[in-house]
Amino acid sequence: MADVKELPFGGSTPLFGGSTGGLLRKAQIEEKYLIVWNSKEEQVFEMPTGGAATMVAGTNVLYLARKEQCHALHRQLVSTFKIRDSKIYRVYPNGEQVLIFPMDGVPSEKSNPGREVVGYVPRKIGDNPNPVDVKFTGKETFDV
């Protein structure tokens, strides 16, 4: 389970004339999600729920109903605006906030000395074994 942390409030919500996809009544009894990021200037961005909003200069705080919406907005902030400091929190009805992305403080696309390597095979693709030579040996091609 991720560490429980206080949210960096003091920011404001982006300027948006529509809705955020409805926090649904379930959010009051289950959970909702929060994405927090810093912007150097006001910029227009696409909301994951449809429409466009203007992020404020400084800290932006936006509640959304689904985790996927927060991840979609995070990807947009990274690719379009080069904003890499966004954090996603799960907010429970009792007010408890849990950081869910990035869990260890480093986004998953970055290298981290403490992070375990998954799915790494130390060879070039041309050095892969011929699948016919591995067939019926009981081993997988990535284990050879």
UniProtKB/Swiss-Prot annotation:
Entry keyword annotation includes Cell inner membrane:
yes
- What domain of life does the UniProt record list for this protein's source? Bacteria
Q: Which UniProt keywords apply?
A: Cell inner membrane, Cell membrane, Membrane, Photosynthesis, Photosystem I
Tell me, in one coarse class, where this protein mainly resides.
membrane
Topology relative to the lipid bilayer, per the entry, is: Peripheral membrane protein
Q: Where in the cell is it found?
A: Cell inner membrane
**Gene3D superfamilies from the UniProt entry:** Photosystem I PsaD, reaction center subunit II
One Gene Ontology term, aspect cellular component? photosystem I reaction center
The answer on whether this UniProt entry bears the keyword Transport reads no
Give the matching SUPFAM superfamilies: Photosystem I subunit PsaD
Q: Which residues form a coiled coil?
A: none
**Cross-referenced Pfam families, in alphabetical order?**
PsaD
InterPro entries from the entry? PsaD, PsaD_sf
Q: Which GO terms describe its biological process?
A: photosynthesis
User: What's the family?
Assistant: Belongs to the PsaD family.
- Describe its assembly: The G.violaceus PSI reaction center is composed of one copy each of PsaA,B,C,D,E,F,L,M and Z, and forms trimeric complexes.
> What is its biological role?
PsaD can form complexes with ferredoxin and ferredoxin-oxidoreductase in photosystem I (PS I) reaction center.
- Please report the name of this protein according to its UniProt entry: Photosystem I reaction center subunit II
